[in-house]
Structure formats: structure tokens, C-alpha cells
Amino acid sequence: MNDYEDLMELTDKQLWDQLPKVEGELKSDFFYELSRRSFEKSDYKSALALAEQARDILLELKDLTSDAEILKIYRAIGMNANALGNHDLVISTLEKALVIAKRSNLDSPEDYSILVDAYDQKEEFQKAIELLEWQFEKYNQIDDDVECAGCLAQISFIFRKLDKQDIALPKLNLALDFAKKTENTNYILLIQTYVAEVLYELENYQECEDLLDKLINSYELLNIKKNLLDMKLLKLQIQWMSNSNEREIIESIKELSLQIIGDDQEAVDQRIRFEQTIINCMEHLGSWSYTRELETRKKRLADLEQLVEVTKE
């Protein structure tokens, strides 16, 4: 047996039975195939251990194996480490893979998105930005406008985390240029939503409100409820900053929050955002009339956040 496709025809039992009889790169292929099947069953611990055995065999072969083979194994290790939340292993493995890939001209940018996520989780923001910029250049070479816009948007998110909205905004404006090339209305609106958020963070309220009016109109026409509520909330926050009637704004936010539907993760996250905003506004006023409601809302917020933690587990 010398063709990997033949391995895919074997049962798990046949693979394990024949494993002691094979050696070299073929043995690595056996471990890789067993790892792949474990991954498909969401048994990531077993899949990772099997992929690491496949890697160890290939590394012992040194020059007797191809870069493509070792890259395949490194990606498998990275995917399983990512599924297990082991960001350090993702980084150490895929950094090695990227060096080999660039050297061998086998560098597919989509293979390293989980490395960006790992850098972000470990707060290695500069490395994440550099990798995203590299991905952007790769996608730009093949005129993949969707991915170009996505890379630029991700870069902007990182700069926002670093409180560098002045750098984030030009990145988003460029992302918007690429999004418009796709002629995908929903994608264009998504990037414009990010632009509105950054304009708000930069306290450019008039420009932000002008854009919000357009977004609210578009989301109403398309009946995209979640985004519509978020944009209406942002507009109310601008009105709050302009010293409008604060109690009326709180009541308007409360009314909007009742329109959130669904129990999925996005709906829960949206409820958390609304509850936190209402609590912040009430605490800002410091009125005794909100004392009991504040206690209730803080309890509700804690329950929602606990639900998110349970979901993550």
C-alpha cells in the first residue's frame, strides 16, 4: 500500500491492525488518517496525539519527506490545538509551518487564520497585525476582495483594542473600498457598521449619525433585525452624549432591548450589550428611583454572562 487514498478506504480496525506492519512516511500517513477521523468525531485530544506521532515520524525522516507532507501534519496539529484552546501550541506549530511554507512557495493565507486568532488570544497584537498584512497582500495578488476587506477589518479591530482608532479608521475605509468591489450589499453594510462604531469612538458624532441614518434605513429595508437594533442603540448613545433628555433615552433603550429575539449566542451577546448600556446610563444619573431596577438588571446581566461562560465550556 503506497497511496494515501487507499488508506481512506480502510476501516479504523484495519488501520490499527496494519499500523505495526508499516514504517516510514507510510506509517506517518496511517497516524494522520487516524487523526483526521478522530478530528471529525470531535475527539480533539486523540486527534492531536495521533497527529503529533505522525509529525515525529516525518521529522525523523528529515530530507526523505516533502515540505508538503510536514505542512499537512503541522496544520493538523494546529487545528486540533486550536479546538482544544491551546494557543501556545498553535503558535509554536504554525510559526514553524509558515517558515517552511514561505520557503517552499506553499504559503496559502487561509491556512494561518487560526494563528491570527492565537496571537490575538495571547495579546501578541503586533504579530497578529503583521500576519494579517501578509494575508492581505496574498489575497490582493489574486483579487480576492472579500478576504482583503476581512483582513483589513481584523487589523482595525486590533487597533481598536489598542485604543488607536485613528489608525483603525483608515484601515476600515480601505476595507470598505474592497467590500464595494464585491457588490455584496450585506458585506458592504457590515463594514460600514464597523466604520460607524469607530466614528463614535473617535467622538465624531455628526459624521457617525449621518452614516447611522443610512444604515438604519438599509437594515429596515432588508429586515436585518439584529443589526438594526445595534445601530439604533448607537444612535441613542450619540443622543446621550449630546445632552438630550437622558431619562427618555434610557426608556428608548429599554424598549429596544425588548425587541431582541432568539436564544442563540448572538442574541445573548446583544442582550448583554443592551443591559450593560442601560445599567451604565442609570448609574450615571445616580437617581434613587432606579435603585431597585438596577439591582434587577445587574442580576440579569450576571445571569447572561454566566450563560456565556457555560456555553464556552
Stretch-by-stretch model annotation:
Residues D29, A68-K72, E110, G150, ...:
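Residue register of alpha-helical TPR repeats
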Residues M1-Q14, E251-E313:
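C-terminal non-catalytic interaction modules
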Residues W16, R55-K62, E95-K102, E133-D144, ...:
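Amphipathic alpha-helical segments of tetratricopeptide repeats
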Residues K41, I77, L84, K122, ...:
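Structural motif corresponding to the intra-repeat A-B loop/turn of tetratricopeptide repeats
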Residues M8, Y44, H87, F125, ...:
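TPR-repeat structural position
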Residues E25, T65-A68, L106, V146, ...:
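Residue signature of alpha-solenoid helical repeat architecture, marking inter-repeat boundaries
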